Amino acid sequence: MNSFPIPVVLLGPGSQAEDETLDYIHMPQGMSVYTPPVLPEPEQIACLTQAQSVLRAILDALDRADPKQPNPRIELWALDEENRQLLKQVLGEGEVSARIEGEYQVYIQEAVFAGVWRVVSTCPDATTDYIEVGAAPEVLRGAARYGANQWSLDVGRVPDGVMNAPSILAEIDDQLLSWHPGKPVHVVNLTLLPMSPQDITFLDETLGAASVTILSRGYGNCRISSTAVPYCWRVVYFNSQDTTILNTVEITDLPEVACAAPEDLRDSHERLTEVLKWVGSI
């Protein structure tokens, strides 16, 4: 009798040739966390009383911050260079920064203490420099609202290759008609929709661009841009390879990702208290 050969077949993951390799989008690998500022020895900064006074004023503003009231503001115009440098060292740079373009320019940087914002505006005849404490600087909300100049969406002629953008624009226009401050945000998630490059281009051209650009570096990177339509924002998230992972339109007064939450302000109060104890100001 002849032996009948039984072929050996390898089984299990990796034993068989794959028809195609899945190319997964990499999600952000890191998350921005609070890092205490590196401070000089207390005796080295004992004479810098102006900066210490500003830090105590910020702590007081954090203690009484109320979203229903105007944000407390601390002016910095009287500080000399040494005191400014100490203040800059203590505040550091947090997750969110913003820029407002127009007749005058405004630069905004959140401190490592969330909800503490440094606001510098420049115009031909004056410069302002102050700290503002709150969810977001009021000038940011105002510029986005008053910088808009397109109160209705006119789709007009639809170019070739554009399929789904007109229906998205109709949804946005409908939401804008009924939206008012205090109403919950309405999000259009373009990532989940069959949007071609031509659709995205047509959408952005129709919404237009306005004066506010915000960058948030919390979990990955997020770019927020105001449009020419009031209360309408483009919000795009990127991973560490600069690949888009979420692309949205938001109808709101200011996207939540750009704002400090109430618990952030409470955490900042605790952290700044520890810093001031080290400095010897409290």
UniProtKB/Swiss-Prot annotation:
The keyword Aminoacyl-tRNA synthetase does not apply. Keywords: Plasmid. It comes from the Bacteria. Pfam families: HupH_C (PF04809). Belongs to the HupH/HyaF family. This is Hydrogenase expression/formation protein HoxQ. It comes from Cupriavidus necator (strain ATCC 17699 / DSM 428 / KCTC 22496 / NCIMB 10442 / H16 / Stanier 337). The gene is hoxQ.
